[in-house]
Curated annotation (Swiss-Prot):
EC number of the protein: 2.7.7.6
Organism whose genome encodes this protein: Mycoplasma pneumoniae (strain ATCC 29342 / M129 / Subtype 1) (Mycoplasmoides pneumoniae)
Name of encoding gene: rpoC
Coiled-coil parts of chain: none
Function: DNA-dependent RNA polymerase catalyzes the transcription of DNA into RNA using the four ribonucleoside triphosphates as substrates.
Note accompanying the cofactor annotation: Binds 1 Mg(2+) ion per subunit.
Residues engaged in binding Zn(2+) 1: 68, 70, 83, 86
Keyword Aminoacyl-tRNA synthetase on entry: no
Protein's UniProt name: DNA-directed RNA polymerase subunit beta'
Name of the top EC class for this enzyme: transferase
Length: 1290
């Protein structure tokens, strides 16, 4: 890296903020190194840039380092010299990425971002108060605009108004001609005294011509004629708009619009007229506050971006390819030159001049934003050319493709296979890959002349070339260096899609044979990987800090707990579960039953000698386990397998003898006292179930709380090793003959067939509609399948199938479930078929199931028809999964964009506000969705929590509710608890530790610098793919099942979409009591009486009532079943109710599907969706009505206003969907890289917005350190953490 680049790099690292503004013409000239005057690029013979052209070396810098164009000055010694022959500065060629030029325009043009901004009006139309369409007509030389109404003020004579656009080509052309005729008539009749003069005759001709539209005449001449006598002036094109912008007085316009707003319907911000005034007011205030003049929206010079950003590339066979931007610049230069010559000529008719000016305007538009034009400029192959705007926006644009997602050097990818021999923090990387990835480090080691102590040694290779050859030939001498290199360098592994942060983890590399990466089996769950051909990418952290960070934070052995629920994510699966299940199985009558051992070693020796079976029930002295907890001392009744299992669990863990184990000590019921009869106890011992997946998961939960963190990976490793070893010992096989026999189903089929026939007859007679018949048939066959399934479940629990391989696999949780068994030897059942869920379906019945079931099982084999239906269902499943993955990924991206700036940046914000939490119960079925314990654990209190009976303090104020304390609270009659929440955290640019509480991935108080916003978004987005895509409909009657569920419901809440008519429920707008429910001819009338007034709600018969006479109703309570419209709830019951409703509804969606997500993550999202308010009364502030303002900013502002004795601002809460929340970010870089790039950058430029780089995305974009994680640590602290991790490795 050169000195200059080092200096620049330092400069970028010290960027504290970025300001965006509209560049004035003077600014563009300051940027420029010279004017581009020719449309040429490079010479076709010499391939050198043409002087004065788009690649001119005199303007943009030399093509070769320290060499001018003509070759007079070469080499670094002439640095800073300007060649007197060719005018090129002698410097590095990299300046061709920085230096800009300019094109001086003959006629001004409007910037397309300022003149065209759909769907909202453009900035020019808002500032001038002219419609968007009229601005376009003036700019593109269709219609004229009035610049000056002249001396005559009488509207009867001079009917034209200032800034009126004269329609001379459209429907209003006749009216405009009439007005012109009236003015011209007045001139030649009243103002010209000499009736024989040329002007009188001219006026008469114009007067007649305007009467008959078919007669040709020059509009320009007619306007000049009017101007001569009245001073009335019109203009066309960007020059006319520029003149109007120059005349504008921003302060006058601002006060005028404020007055207009006061006179308009101030209370209704939704009113179209008010909306328009608010938009104008916003734009005018932006210009006022930023001290920018609106005239800068019109360009006199066009900047030419550096040539290396729009290169010409030579291909094979003397062909060239070029960036589309060069084509646009060529077009601008050619048209500009042509217009210059026309204007210099002076004899060309005005219509031709105007046409050339329009072409110039269009060419500049195409350069800036080709895709938003009516007819975009096309290449030879009819492809739309990519303009500057197109290079910024979208997935392939600058923001997302180049700044936020870069291709990474020192990386590779390969197929993964299992590596059970590895430790948890290790990964096996093929030797070929290691040599390629670590090549520079290996070469350094080979040519190094000093050892680690600084003593001089003889290098293995004498030069870099020799070292490279040694690596290429895999010389035996290199391996010592290779091992030394990889010992100091962890690698990062990533599996796409990276749905949560555990998709990237660090490992210590180990060299393996072959070409596949070997992955530790315990980390597969976190990566969501399996070994059926998945590929993973490897990345090498290069700098010392990156290596320390990988070790201190990213190492796989540190990621034991999942993020979304704090449960272990490294639970053993499949073979490991099967092995431990086999190991902990108990059987009566096995070899060696009744033997009593004194030590663990004795038991192991007896087993290995074949004297005792693994499953034999034996006794062992409790003294054999000096560090384990027992309720009493004596002889423990257990099995050899369980002795071996408990031996690897380490100390301080109670002896685990049954699935429902005690967390403190092994219970007394398994211990025979010293005076007792051990053999009698063994004979009387009831056989206990073996340890399946759930037991092991519960055990890991316990291990996490009891064992020191550094010892946990070793114990997990031991459990894994036991699992693999004993699943091999179990000799489990799978055969078609293992499948149990089941033969009761035929009688159910016969009964169901009879019933289906009956339904068909009812339908034919008109007693049932087709929808009702379909519904009943589907319900009937589902019932049959449930019967078959339940009988099979009973069948496989029989003693005869106890050791059946397939049953053992399912029972242990290793593989398979009851649904698989039902299909294997019961029936396949109903299959789904494709259906467009989103269409407006009149019958409200979704027919997405084939109503003919597959009666055969896989064991019997399917018929041709059944096979066809089965494959139809399977393909639909695959398609749905692909659709769901894409939709879920997009939602995660939106969530991250809305929340990424939320980082833990303080210990305690000192808030006195919190949320009241209670158990979430499904009101209709009274089933528990989320318990009070789950909602309060790991959070901080606001005030003390007292026992209602004894008044004793359970938890003090501002203290953490631990699991023990949460259990104590739930043991009392307390139903509601006030806890701290991120929603009410008073930190402006982040969240404090106490409001967030415990970090679920560590079980400790969340650390400063944790990016909780991103973690919340990932925790909610990652399980998104598991949510169902179906929208359940069960007929015209609206029930809970009739609503959007799963992913669709989640989308409805996060995007604040109003439910469909048949889904929406009626809510009470008053607090009171249901006085009466009466039935009329068309509806049910519900009368609610409050202390102030009474309301009657008309409920259609298709809706299901939730209230009865005498019921008390609150504001926003549901009167009918269905989903609440969130915006209506906000209007009726306020923001707190909305927040509570959203939390409950999101939790319902996930918990019904069996997915647990902590409340705090949902609250983070809701904080971002509900943190903005809309001003209804600006008080004494500089804000204006309708302006959106952040709640923190408003609180600070009102505090200062009240302390100064001024009127505070009054504002109402708003709820936005995640799309809008991300776009309304305080950072324009973050918002622009999300969506609507053009609009966000335009707005930011007009208000001269400053981005203080507080979030994560902004810092990634500028290439700085993110203000999270180790961004909060010093290099020394990071180095210490890295070194400590190495010491803890086992």
């Amino acid at each position: 890296m050169t000195k200059r680049n080092k200096k620049n790099n330092k400069l970028y690292k010290n960027i504290k903020a970025i300001k965006l503004s509209i560049a004035s013409n003077d600014t563009i000239l300051n940027w420029s190194e010279g004017e581009v005057t020719k449309a040429e690029t490079i010479n076709y013979k010499s391939l050198k840039p043409e002087p004065g052209g788009l690649f001119d070396e005199a303007i943009f810098g030399p093509v070769k380092d320290y060499e001018c164009a003509c070759g007079k000055f070469k080499k670094i010694k002439y640095r800073g010299v300007r060649c007197d022959r060719c005018g090129v500065w002698v410097t590095e060629s990299i300046v061709r990425r920085e230096r800009m030029g300019h094109i001086a325009l003959v006629s001004p043009v409007a910037h397309i971002w300022m003149s065209k901004e759909l769907p909202s009006p453009s900035k020019i139309s808002l500032v001038l108060n002219i419609s968007y369409k009229e601005v376009e007509q003036v700019l593109y030389f269709v219609n004229y605009i009035v610049l000056d109404t002249g001396k005559i003020k009488d509207p009867k004579i001079m009917p034209f108004k200032f800034k009126e656009v004269l329609d001379l080509a459209g429907k209003g052309s006749l009216t405009t001609r009439q007005k012109m005729r009236r003015v011209i008539g007045y001139i030649f009749r009243n103002l010209i005294k000499n009736r024989s003069s040329e002007d009188y005759r001219k006026g008469k001709i114009f007067y007649e011509s305007l009467k008959n539209s078919s007669l040709p005449f020059s509009l320009n001449d007619a306007f000049n004629y009017i101007k001569k006598y009245t001073g009335f002036r019109v203009g066309i094109g960007a020059e006319a708009i520029l003149e109007l912008l120059n005349k504008i007085d921003l302060n006058y316009e601002f006060s005028k619009l404020n007055d207009a707003l006061r006179k308009a319907k101030k209370d209704s911000v939704e009113d179209a007229k008010v909306k328009k005034i608010l938009r104008q007011l916003e734009t005018i205030s932006w210009f006022r506050n930023s001290k920018l003049h609106p005239k800068n929206m019109i360009l006199h010079t066009v900047p030419v971006i550096p040539p290396d950003i729009r290169p010409i590339i030579q291909l094979d066979g003397a062909k060239f390819t070029t960036s589309d931007i060069n084509n646009f610049y060529r077009r601008v230069i050619i048209r500009n030159d042509r217009l210059r010559r026309i204007l210099e000529d002076g004899t060309v008719p005005a219509i031709v001049v105007n046409n050339e000016k329009r072409l110039l305007q269009e060419s500049v538009d195409a350069l800036f934003d080709n895709s938003s034009r009516h007819k975009p400029a096309l290449s030879k192959d009819k492809r739309s050319l990519k303009s500057l705007t197109d290079r910024l926006k979208g997935k392939q644009g600058l923001f997302r493709h180049n700044l936020l997602g870069k291709r990474v050097d020192y990386s590779g990818r390969s197929v993964i296979v299992v590596g059970p021999e590895l430790k948890m923090y290790e990964v096996g990387i093929p030797a070929l890959m290691i040599l390629k990835l670590f090549k520079p480090f290996i070469i350094h080691g080979l040519i190094n002349k000093f050892d680690s102590n600084g003593n001089e040694i003889r290098p293995i290779a004498s030069s870099i070339r020799q070292a490279e050859d040694m690596i290429k030939n895999q010389d035996d001498l290199i391996w010592g260096i290779v091992y030394d290199v990889i010992k100091d360098r962890p690698v990062l592994l990533n599996r796409a899609p990276t749905l949560h942060r555990l998709g990237i983890q660090a490992f210590e590399p180990r060299i393996v044979d072959g070409k596949a990466i070997r992955l530790h089996p315990l980390v597969t769950t976190a990566f969501n990987a399996d070994f059926d051909g998945d590929q993973m990418a490897v990345h090498v952290p290069l700098s010392e800090n990156a290596v320390n960070e990988a070790r201190a934070i990213l190492l796989a052995s540190k990621h034991i707990l999942g993020l979304k629920d704090g449960r272990p994510i490294v639970t053993p699966t499949q073979d490991m579960v099967l092995g431990n299940y086999y190991l902990t199985t108990e059987r009566k009558g096995q070899t060696g039953e009744g033997i009593i051992f004194g030590t663990v070693h004795e038991a192991r020796a007896a087993y290995e000698a074949g004297k005792v079976h693994l499953h034999a029930i034996v006794g062992i002295s409790t003294k054999a386990f000096p560090n384990k907890h027992f309720e009493a001392q004596g002889t423990l009744i257990t099995t050899v397998g369980k002795i071996i299992f408990n031996d690897v669990l380490g100390d301080n863990i109670p002896y685990i003898n049954e699935g429902e184990f005690d967390e403190h000590a092994c219970p007394q019921k398994f211990i025979v006292p010293p005076s007792g009869d051990v053999r009698a106890a063994i004979a009387a011992h009831q056989v206990l179930p073996a340890f399946g997946k759930k037991v092991i998961s519960k055990l890991i939960d316990l291990l996490y709380t009891v064992v020191e963190f550094k010892d946990l990976p070793r114990i997990l490793e031991n459990i894994k090793a036991l699992g693999f070893k004993y699943s091999t010992h179990s000799s489990t096989t799978v055969s078609v003959f293992d499948i149990p026999k089941y033969s009761n189903k035929q009688q159910y089929f016969d009964e169901a067939d009879q019933q289906v026939l009956k339904y068909k007859q009812f339908y034919n007679k008109g007693l049932l509609t087709d929808d009702e018949r379909y519904k009943r048939v589907v319900k009937l066959w589902n019932g049959v399948k449930e019967k078959v399934s339940s009988e099979i479940q009973d069948l496989i629990k029989r003693e005869e199938y106890r050791d059946n391989s397939i049953v053992v696999m399912a029972d242990s949780g290793a593989r398979g479930n009851i649904s698989n068994f039902t299909q294997l030897f019961g029936m396949r059942g109903l299959m789904s078929k494709s259906f467009n869920y989103e269409r407006n379906n009149q019958s409200k019945i979704i027919k997405d199931t084939i109503e003919v079931p597959i009666k055969h099982s896989f064991l019997e084999g399917l018929t041709i028809n059944e096979y066809f239906n089965s494959s139809y269902g399977a393909r639909k499943g695959m398609t749905d999964t692909a659709m769901k993955t894409a939709k879920s990924g997009y939602m995660t991206r939106k969530l991250v964009d809305a929340t990424h700036e939320l980082i833990i940046n303080h210990d305690d914000c000192g808030t006195r506000k919190g949320i009241v939490v209670e158990a979430i119960v499904e009101t209709k079925t009274r089933s528990l969705v989320e318990s009070l314990f789950d909602r309060i654990v790991n959070r901080y209190t606001i005030g003390p929590i007292l026992d209602p009976e004894t008044k004793a303090e359970i938890v003090p104020a501002n203290s953490l509710i631990t699991q023990e304390l949460a259990k104590q609270i739930c043991a009392t009659s307390i139903k509601q608890v006030l806890v701290r929440s991120v929603i009410y955290c008073e930190r402006e640019n982040g969240v404090c530790q106490y409001c967030f509480g415990v970090d679920l991935s560590t079980g400790k108080l969340v650390e400063l610098g944790t990016a909780v916003g991103v973690i919340a978004a990932q925790s909610i987005g990652e399980p998104g793919t598991q949510l169902t895509m179906r929208t359940f409909h069960t007929g015209g009657v609206s029930t809970e099942n009739n609503l959007a569920q799963g992913f669709e419901r989640l989308k409805q809440i996060f995007e604040v979409v109003a439910p469909k008519d048949y889904e929406r429920c009626v809510i009470s707008e008053v607090k009171g009591v249901v006085k009466s429910i009466t039935t009329t001819q068309n509806a049910q009338e519900v009368l609610i009486e409050s202390s102030v007034d009474e309301r009657t709600y008309s409920i259609p018969f298709s809706a299901q009532l939730r209230v009865k006479v005498g019921d008390a109703v609150e504001l926003g309570s549901k009167i009918t079943e269905g989903s609440i419209d969130i915006r209506q709830l906000l209007r009726v019951a306020g923001i707190q109710r909305v927040r509570q409703y959203m939390i409950v509804e999101i939790q319902k969606v996930y918990r019904i599907q069996g997915i647990e997500i902590a409340d705090k993550y949902v609250e983070i999202i809701i904080r971002q969706l509900t943190s903005l308010l809309q001003v209804t009364d600006a008080g004494s502030s500089n804000l204006f009505v309708g302006q959106l303002v952040h709640s923190h900013h408003l609180n600070e502002l009102n505090k200062s206003l009240l302390l100064s004795g001024k009127m505070p601002v009054i504002a109402i809460n708003q709820v936005f969907g995640i799309d809008e929340a991300a776009s309304k970010s305080n950072s324009f870089l973050s918002a622009a890289s999300f969506q609507d790039t053009k609009k966000i950058l335009t707005d930011a430029a007009v208000k001269t917005q400053v981005d203080y780089l507080l979030g994560l995305k902004e810092n990634v974009i500028i290439g700085g350190k993110i203000p999270a994680g180790t961004g909060f640590l010093t290099d020394e602290e990071l180095a210490y953490l890295g070194a400590k991790t190495v010491q803890e490795e086992y």
